[in-house]
Amino acid sequence: MAEVVDPVVIAIVAIYLIAVVVIGYYSRIRLKSAMDYYVAGRRIGSVVNGLALESTYLSPASMLGLPAYIFLIGYPFWWAMVAIICGMPIAALLTASALRKYAPVSFADYYADRFGDEKLRWWIGIIVIVGSILYITLSLVGMALFMVAILKMPYVIALVIGTIIVMFYVVYGGMIATTWNAAMQAIVMSFAAIIAAAAIVWQLGGFEGVYFAAEQSYAKIWNSPANAPDVPHLFSSSWIAILGWYFVWHYGFATMPYTVVRFFTVMDIKTARRSIFWCSLIGGAFYVSLELIGITAKYMIEKSHPIAVAAGGNMTATQVLGVIQKTYGIGTVTDYSMIAAVEALGNPVILGILCAGGLAIAMSTAAGWAVTVNTIIARDWMVKLLKWKRAEEKPVLYGRIIAFIFLLVSFFIAISPPALVLDLSGWAFVVVICSLAPGLILGLWWKRATRAAMWITAIVMFFLSMFAWMRAHLVLGHHARFFLNDVLFGNPNVLITPHQTWLIPLGFIVFIIVSLLTKPPEEERIQKYCVELTKEV
């Protein structure tokens, strides 16, 4: 990596950051009420909301994590990309239109009303807090890595700068700033990925060169489980593993708090549907670009990165990343592989655009989760449950304080992150989806869904998912290994279940069984929060 800070890169990123600050400032002027802070006054159109959905949902786990996993495993995550994009239209059918018709303010509102229990806000809030901390952490890690690429500074200093920037526009602008900034950030990040991918394809002489680079780096890259045991990696060695990778992120768009709340901000039901179209279209182009960067990253780093060139071309990509890690104190340096591949192009304009795009996606995701969690705590806990008059009189102030606290907590975790950004993302997804998705989806579409099922599923699946993931990660060495492999089979590698994805269908099974065994809800509640909301959606 070149040690000199390139003024072109800094100039491009500075323009982007100025735009963020301007949007944050003018959003604060437009901030007239708590409703503006929490749900942007429900005035957002389809294109803006679609762009905001993309940049919030497709986090640094996508921009850094997806290419990093291709770099690690040597297998292009086609199924993961397809799963995420295909999961977007599902949201239009399952949750988006129905929830916009209901028009809540907080993610917990529907659960409390549908199941007739305000105390559910406590437990839902705890689960959302866990997801928020994981996601804000991975977003701050992403920001710091791009700041390292921009300013060639130590990772921790870059992390401080990135956290302060996010604090400024989230704490002061709320959902209005978050939404408009997210829309602008979607354009920047998508354009950045497309430009970087196009430049790599051009430098390699076209798609034939891309194919050659991929095969040179990973001889088994095109093999599927049908070729087992001759597969790229243990974690893609079976069809169960492939299905696991597919479903980790598939249902998140319809059920994760930070995307669901975006359906609350739009003008009407039709706008909610159309916003998903725009998100799917632009997100698809973004992901194809990331795949191209990922499968060529190793080749580009070894052949053209300044560190490898300075060593006479005798360094592996892993060794190059090791030098970067030692120089800047980066915790999970594999996440830097995508940036290193673009650095290998030797084009400061493209690197500047990529870094601006990387900051955009990281800031958008961190902001989306920060606003989601401060709504849960400041509104649901303080006002709805604890009846604090001060919080009710000054909801925006308390929301800002909470956002600040969560960004600070995530900052300290990001100093030495516990896993790769894609791993943190998958962990958050599985924990939240297996615990809360059954109650949301079946609550809307199944009359028999009961309060007891909601409580039991949320509690049991939350603790089980936390334990299973951590045992697989800490005891067996990786989250992709089924957490009881050693106990049941005496071999940690027998069954590969990425992020313990079996927990998601299990959550639905538990919910259905408990619902059938417990007292059904009142007819009036079913009519209002199930039948009416799903009629003609």
Which residue ranges define each predicted feature?
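Membrane-embedded helix-loop-helix hairpins and adjacent transmembrane boundary segments
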Residues: M1-V537
